């Protein structure tokens, strides 16, 4: 069995270029949560020239709306949200420097093309394993849009968060490859 490949967030172009669709990796470092309501607000703020709550350069956004934390824990269950819900907003944020998105499910051609253009990557987190994902979160802090409740933007410090490369920066798609390989 090969050694775990642990990536340190934030991400450089070289790290993103080294990733291939189907790779399983682990993320450690600072990432952010944001779902569709937060994405909509971020894009509106960009259009209005307002400052962003965090610098997108090299950053990762996890499409998740965590459950409330139990006593003594930094966060509750934190499973992935369907990435396609962010497709209308993702190209704008990628163009602003966002390198990594973490969610579940397929993405639009526009998102795939934008990842290729700006050297980005889309990871799938393990659906149905929200409690496991929460164990990888060492700290969590709401940094923007507290009024959105579970959809507020949070800064997470994670340790070895397991993810799979779905879309690499060459446009390769692990879901499509899997469908081709397992067709009967």
Located regions from the model:
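Active-site/ligand-binding-proximal alpha/beta "capping" segment
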Residues: 90, 166-184
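Short, structured beta-strand/loop micro-motifs enriched in basic residues and often containing a Trp
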Residues: 2-11
């Amino acid at each position: 069995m090969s050694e775990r490949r642990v990536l340190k967030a934030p991400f450089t172009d070289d790290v993103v270029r080294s990733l291939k669709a189907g790779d399983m990796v682990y993320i450690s470092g600072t990432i952010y949560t944001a779902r569709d309501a937060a994405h909509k607000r971020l894009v509106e703020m960009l259009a209005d020239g307002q400052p962003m709550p965090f610098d997108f350069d090299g950053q990762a956004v996890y499409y998740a709306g965590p459950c409330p934390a139990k006593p003594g824990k930094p966060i509750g269950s934190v499973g992935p949200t369907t990435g396609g819900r962010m497709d209308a907003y993702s190209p704008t944020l990628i163009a602003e420097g966002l390198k990594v998105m973490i969610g579940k499910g397929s993405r639009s051609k526009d998102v795939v093309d934008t990842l290729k253009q700006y050297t980005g990557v889309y990871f799938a987190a393990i659906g149905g394993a929200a409690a496991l994902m929460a164990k990888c979160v060492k700290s969590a802090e709401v940094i923007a849009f507290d009024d959105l409740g579970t959809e507020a933007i949070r800064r997470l410090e994670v340790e070895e968060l397991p993810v799979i490369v779905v879309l690499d920066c060459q446009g390769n798609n692990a879901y499509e490859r899997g469908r081709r390989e397992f067709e009967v």
